[in-house]
Amino acid sequence: MKKYIFMTLTVALLGLTACTEDAFDRINKDYEHPSPEAVPAALQLTDAIMSTGFSTVSGDFAFYLSSLNEQEIGMGNNQLMFAEMRNSSEWAASTTFNNVWNSIYGNLQNIRQMQSKIENEVPGNVGQFDILGMAQVLEAVNFGVLTDMFGDIPYSEAVQGQGNLQPKLDAQKDVYTGILATLDKAIGNLEKGKSLTSAGNQDIAYKGVASKWLAAAHALKARYLLHKLAVEPNVLQK
């Protein structure tokens, strides 16, 4: 009898040993928070567009610039007067600039991830030249707003995560040069991806129509060439 009990316990223990590793693998896998690599670039596109529209273009900068320009000149200083009544230090508070600075660089991290997945042909992202071009247009907009507002900014060494926590400042004229080069890449990829529909409904700006992104890229290229002329007047002679 003891012999049978011993054999039964041995088999049971062996069975537990065999399944323990698999069970722990399942338990330790985080299904709620997949790694960035597991998320297709197309799904990140929506967030990149939203963040660019609401944080970069229509965020704090839009309020402060309108107050310092249109409202200050045309409305009897109303906005500035009310701002001073609310908080006399509002215009010098660190959050005035830190919030939008951090949100734009956070958005750029997302945009660079999208590009990396397509360029490195991560499964599920292969050949999506239309999305790659869209991401490059969005990158140009975000860096463009940053340098328009702050002048010299981290650019060539920026958005490297833990790889570089103290990126150098690049001169504004060099940032504009980089932006124009990025837009050239975007135009090439959008031309290549004209017939693709990789973005689908994730493109909440132009509904996945590459030709509209192309038009935006050309318009932005004209804008930033003019901005570059302001800091490097002889640029057209090169």
Residue ranges of predicted features:
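Alpha-helical transmembrane segments and their juxtamembrane interfaces
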Residues: 12-13, 31, 57, 233
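Intrinsically disordered, low-complexity segments enriched in small/polar residues
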Residues: 13, 57, 72-76, 81
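Enrichment for repetitive, rod-forming helical segments
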Residues: 9-10, 33, 228-230
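Structured, solvent-exposed acidic/aromatic patches
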Residues: 37-42, 76-238
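Membrane-proximal, proline-rich intrinsically disordered regions
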Residues: 4, 19-73
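Sec-dependent bacterial lipoprotein signal peptides
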Residues: 1-17
